[in-house]
Amino acid sequence: MKNTIIYIDGGNLYYGQLRGSANKWLDLEAFSAKLLNPDHAIAAVKYFTSRVIDKSADQCHTQRQSQYLTALATRPLVKIIEGRYREQSELLAPVQEPCTSCDRKRADGRIKVRRITEKMTDVNIADAMLRDAYERRTECLVLISGDTDLAPIVKTVRYHVGIPVLVFNPQRSICNELRRYATFYRNIPQGSADGCRLPDSFETSDGRTIRCPAAWMPGRTGDS
């Protein structure tokens, strides 16, 4: 059995596999095991994510994410590593002429837009992979991401440290950079998360009850 650590790019997985599906209440341990051959013994699942900045008044998105992270924290193999989102305003030229009554339009035609970008996730993933590889904590690394920025760390771990790196890309498009350097590369088929749900309701060791958000219950779909 190969001692294996999983590194999951949470945002990449969400937009590639989970958005608009009924699989958001995902059991990361079960999902990871489903991707691998039986000769892998999963030692840890490291989940990299950032707390969302909710655009709605009722904060429903942040509440659901918080419930999910609380549920994940109870899983014995899962470790959550958080980055952050940065919000900033920019002035951009519209692709199409906006409504003339738009109060965000300036005299030069540009519009003030709100841009939210995730920070630190790729850095945190690269740091964790490099540390685990150099300290020989694992015999195999599995990256679940389609982010081209992670190609250099895949190359370093495979060719300079000498530990195999398997890449499972949640996106539909092929990432040639990751495929070039990975020991094994595969795009994850849509629907692969089916059947990998956490229990809809369960009690923790300290007596708390954790429930799946109503919007994420079986039969419900959408982007939230």
Residue ranges of each PLM-predicted region?
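Nuclease catalytic cores that cleave nucleic-acid phosphodiester bonds
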Residues: 82-224
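Domain-level signal for Mg2+-assisted phosphodiester chemistry and nucleotide/NA-binding surfaces
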Residues: 1-104, 110-114, 160-169
